[in-house]
Amino acid sequence: MAHKKAGGSTRNGRDSESKRLGVKRFGGESVLAGSIIVRQRGTKFHAGNNVGCGRDHTLFALADGKVKFEVKGPKNRKFISIEAE
């Protein structure tokens, strides 16, 4: 009699969808107001001049201009600002 033994089960085979986080506009790039600059979890980057912070910590431009990355303060925090053109 032809028999096939039953296959075993597995506990793998799933993964979460990627969230597409990261820097979307780099230093020196021109942006329009409302443009997303960084998508992040927590505040890896902080909002500087003319930059807003969304409730998921997304940083976005509040004015047209050029993106500027800078490190400030005693804790060497990374700030992102928009310099008006």
Swiss-Prot record:
It holds the Pfam family Ribosomal_L27. GO terms for biological process: translation. Residues 1-21 are annotated as: Disordered. Keywords: Ribonucleoprotein, Ribosomal protein. GO terms for cellular component: cytosolic large ribosomal subunit. GO terms for molecular function: structural constituent of ribosome. InterPro entries: Ribosomal_bL27, Ribosomal_bL27_CS. Belongs to the bacterial ribosomal protein bL27 family. This is Large ribosomal subunit protein bL27. It comes from Photorhabdus laumondii subsp. laumondii (strain DSM 15139 / CIP 105565 / TT01). The lineage of its organism: Bacteria, Pseudomonadati, Pseudomonadota, Gammaproteobacteria, Enterobacterales.
